[in-house]
Structure formats: C-alpha cells, structure tokens
Amino acid sequence: MAIMASRKHLKRFKSPVHWPIHPKEYKWTVKPSPGPHAIENSLPLMIIVRDILKVADNAREARKIINSGEVLVDGRPRKNYKFPVGFMDVVSIPRTGDVYRVLPDERGRLVLHPIDEENAGFKLCKIVNKTTIKGGRTQLNLHDGRNYLSDDEFRVGDVVKLSIPEQEILERIPFEKDSLGLVTGGRHTGEIGKIKKINITRSSMPNTAVIETGAGKTFLTLKDYVFVIGKDESVISLPGGK
C-alpha cells in the first residue's frame, strides 16, 4: 500500500521548484496525472485554480470548479484536477472572461500571462520529431503530445500555429536564421532574441544556436531550447510587452 501511495501522491518538498506552493505548509500536494506534459514541465490544474489564479480558497472548492467544466485548456473543458498544464497552453475561465497563456519567466518558472481575445484564438506548438506512417504519409509530433498528418514541408524545430478550439494548423513558423526565438531551458530560460546562427555539429555533441537579444546581448544555447515565436516580431503577446 505504501508503494502505491508514493506513486499517486507527491510530497511538497519534492515538487518542481517552479510550482508556487510553500514546501512546508502541508506534507502532500497534488501529483499531475499522465498527459501532454511531463511533471517537471507542467502545473496541475488544481495548482493553477487555487494557488495561482486564486479562484478557489481551498482544494475542495477548486475541485468543484474544475469538475463542473468551468476551466478550459486549449478551448476544451478539463474536469481532471490533476490534468498537467504546460508551456504554451491557453487556460480560460469563460465565467470570468479571463484567458492566459502559460510561458516561462527568466527564473525558469511557469507563469500565466493574461492575453486578449485575439491571442486566445490560437496556440503555438513545436515540432519535436516526424515519423513516416503506413502509406508513406508524414506525421508531425508536437511538444504537447499532439500528432498531425501533413505534407513534408514541415521540419523538426519548426513551430505551427493552431486554432483554438478547432486545433487546425493555421501557419508554419520556420526555425531558421533571423527568426525570433524564446529560450525554454538552461541558464537563459525566458530570454527572447533573434537566431543569428545555427550550429549543426553532426556528432554526439548537441546542436546549438546563437541568440541576440533586443538589448544587443549575445549568447549560445542548445538548439532544442529555442522555440520560435515569429519572424520579424512575435506572433504572441509577451509579459512586459517584449
């Protein structure tokens, strides 16, 4: 029984550092259920409703709100309070009219950035790999677990703009020199800048990219950490009007 409990629950002091909860307030916290995002890259819906948005005062109220279908993720009601919400997901509460996009800040924490009606109509997803399925068709595998059948013009590292709630591909944002990128990992998490150079090593060493921020700062980061958000300017609104 103890082994099963450890799998179903999560001690607060072992929760990811980006969760906005006090590690010593209580012993246990909600553990995200398996889903589109890994535990280290997500927030349980309960934490969002109770601790971040403060729509509920306690876990019981939060579960009631979530179970009633009042909270939407990417335009669809999610009634599982353990549902993992992650990077680029759009969270909305129609009753209050509030809509947010999940983004990383410069300390590596996931934050809910308020967005307007136009931004609420789409989300961005990165192509993490492609596979060829039966019949020779190409399947795009996205960072949030989605899969799409498409033509072969898309490349790994590109980002697609998806409509919400229809989930249709509206636009391709290519990963290429001079595209605008948001860094999602490493010491430069949350920083935004132009891709000035892409270094393909063709060895066991990881590929890298050189990023230049609007302030003229230049740094090197892993290519996999760069999430393109536009060509000349960002297609999404960003915290602080970046």
Swiss-Prot record:
Q: Does the keyword RNA-binding apply?
A: yes
For this protein, what is any one GO molecular function term?
rRNA binding
The parts of the chain that form a coiled coil are none
Every S4 RNA-binding domain range:
43-106
SUPFAM superfamilies reported for this sequence: Alpha-L RNA-binding motif (SSF55174)
Q: Which domain of life is it from?
A: Archaea
Keywords (A to Z) from UniProt: Ribonucleoprotein, Ribosomal protein, RNA-binding, rRNA-binding
- NCBIfam families membership: PRK04313.1 (NF003312)
Q: What is this protein called?
A: Small ribosomal subunit protein eS4
| Species, as recorded | Methanothermobacter thermautotrophicus (strain ATCC 29096 / DSM 1053 / JCM 10044 / NBRC 100330 / Delta H)
